[in-house]
Regions:
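Short, electropositive alpha-helical surface patch
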Residues: 73-85, 189-197, 221-222, 226, ...
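Conserved beta-alpha-beta core of the PfkB/ribokinase-like small-molecule kinase fold
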Residues: 146-224, 231-232, 241-243
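Glycine-rich phosphate/pyrophosphate-binding beta-alpha loops
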Residues: 26, 99, 145-149
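Conserved N-terminal subdomain of the carbohydrate kinase-like
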Residues: 60-143
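Conserved phosphate-binding/catalytic region of the ribokinase-like
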Residues: 2-3, 7-16, 162-163, 218-262
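Glycine-rich phosphate/adenosyl-contacting loop at the front of the ribokinase-like
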Residues: 2-86, 260-262
């Protein structure tokens, strides 16, 4: 390949990260002066939050997903644009509404979710609606498991990850377990594990590691998944205890510092 062709290939990589998955509206509580619970509208969804983080770091990000043609879908699009995230891959539909999630903050700092998603627009993304040119033009492709709870989004997510793998992309995967969204936990485990075959990088919680492997030991659980699926890097979040990281046989554990849950 000549020098001009090499320059063309580099120039075609328009994005650092393209993220696919759910984009929803979280309603988070706070107390007003009368001590009544008030819910504040906040666009969210783990894959979209990741894209926002990438953009805040000064890198180029794009998002692939589906929202409703409603006021919440409009907020989602506006939020992406304000964050500097490419919205070319976002599909809008009038067949169903944007998914909503009401959040309860627990004394431990953890969160509990109540979802209004029956169905939600994010569940209805079909593979033929996925803009593959975005995947062609990225260095890293990221996806999670919430978009795989139901069809057609399950197939769309799996096929997009498979396509990214075939194109030699670095693939990041977040097996994010939300039990109430799955038909049953057996299906959740099977689907979440099936997607591991595409991952180079996995971010997982210690509860999710135990759910998928039956192991509570971080060394054993991470080694099992990484060897079985060829994963190159794994980060395990440990809530208040920090995080654990593994690359090959090299491991590290870092403590957490106090933060206010928001």
């Amino acid at each position: 390949m000549g020098r001009n062709s090499e320059k063309t290939e580099v120039r075609k990589m328009m994005y650092d990260v393209v993220s696919l998955g759910e984009f929803i509206i979280d309603f988070t509580p706070y107390s007003n002066p009368e001590n009544k619970i008030v819910f504040e509208q906040k666009p969210g969804g783990a894959p979209c939050n990741l894209a926002a983080g990438v953009a805040k770091l000064g890198k180029k990000a794009a998002f692939i997903g589906k929202v409703g043609k409603d006021m919440f879908g409009d907020v989602c699009i506006e939020t992406l644009e304000q964050a500097g995230i490419d919205t070319k891959g976002v599909v809008m539909t009038d067949a169903c509404n944007t998914t909503l999630a009401f959040v309860k903050l627990l004394p431990s700092g953890d969160r509990r979710f109540s979802f209004y998603r029956n169905p939600g627009a994010d569940m209805m993304l079909a593979f033929d609606e996925v803009d593959l040119s975005l995947i062609d033009n990225t260095k890293i492709f990221h996806f999670g498991s919430v978009s795989m709870t139901h069809e057609p989004a399950r197939t769309a997510t799996m096929e997009a990850a498979k396509y990214a793998k075939s194109k030699g992309k670095i693939i990041s995967y977040d097996p994010n377990l939300r039990e109430s969204l799955w038909p049953d936990l057996g299906t959740a485990k099977d689907v979440m594990l099936e997607a591991m075959q595409y991952a180079d990088i996995v971010k997982i919680s210690h509860e999710e590691l135990e759910f998928l492997t039956g192991l509570t030991d971080l060394d054993q659980g991470s080694k099992l998944l990484m060897e079985q699926y060829g994963i190159k890097m794994m980060t395990i979040t440990l809530a208040a205890d920090g995080a654990y990281g593994r690359v090959g046989d090299n491991t590290v554990k870092l403590g957490a510092y106090d933060v206010k849950t928001i």
